[in-house]
């Protein structure tokens, strides 16, 4: 009997040890769990477990390494209606097809579906994330030109729909294309392809596979589609949210690829395959121009690593199959 009890104790200790070092017993986060984030803003340790002590948030922490954020603040306390109108100054110009579509109220309403957005870190970090989100999406929807009134970076959010679109339909059994529908770029982030519409729709509770044009006709849904993309990690890519709020810790491979926390890595996430690792690039410069203007209007510094000129692009995958959303 004593021998049996001793064997049980040894087995129990072994199981606990395997859990601590990251064995195959249901890890909670990080690469061991498909890129999942810890609930409550907790840190993900190198072994894939959630917590808030230095064992989790210290060396080799994978994500959300700053620990839980302070109590959430309503986004309107960080960006007022008048500042929003100044940031997107010419979005309602008569020459912009999006005139009247991208409203402040729709932005604030959509952000409530993602309470971590603009609510992670200190006030400067929160404002910088708002500037980064609006900067990247302004590049995607810009109607500006070099000699435009108030400069090229005052013309974000001029377009809702992609110009010269195609169907963007890929045969996938999980998210089949609906008859007669096209999945071209729409909304602030210009979401495209049927599998992205399908997964986004599932996340926000709207049938975007059958009704993709809701992204171009319902302004709250439109902003939600962009925030879904922003808050969602796609392995091996972290989420833009985690990068800009410094909750992402680059791996040794990321460091070797010069992918470090900052606005430049967000550009890499969004369009690195076409824009990053090519030296000076006018598209990257345009994204930075919007970001700097918006940071100035919000009264916050730019942070480090603004470009991706020397970064190796993240590995591209066709399907967003392992998505984890920060909420």
Curated annotation (Swiss-Prot):
Propeptide, chain numbering: 317-327
Chitin-binding type-1 domain segment(s): 27-67
Organism: Phaseolus vulgaris
Gene Ontology biological process: cell wall macromolecule catabolic process; chitin catabolic process; defense response to fungus; polysaccharide catabolic process
UniProt keyword terms in alphabetical order: Carbohydrate metabolism, Chitin degradation, Chitin-binding, Disulfide bond, Glycosidase, Hydrolase, Plant defense, Polysaccharide degradation, Signal, Vacuole
Positions annotated as active site in the UniProt record: 140
Listed GO CC annotations: vacuole
Disulfide bonds: 29-44, 38-50, 43-57, 61-65, 96-158, 169-177, 276-308
Molecular function GO terms recorded: chitin binding; endochitinase activity
Primary location class: other
Family: Belongs to the glycosyl hydrolase 19 family. Chitinase class I subfamily.
Record-given protein name: Endochitinase CH5B
Subcellular location: Vacuole
One Pfam family named in its UniProt record: Glyco_hydro_19
Enzyme Commission (EC) number: 3.2.1.14
Function: Defense against chitin-containing fungal pathogens.
Chemical reaction(s) catalysed: Random endo-hydrolysis of N-acetyl-beta-D-glucosaminide (1->4)-beta-linkages in chitin and chitodextrins
Enzyme class: hydrolase
Tree of life domain: Eukaryota
Residues of the signal peptide: 1-26
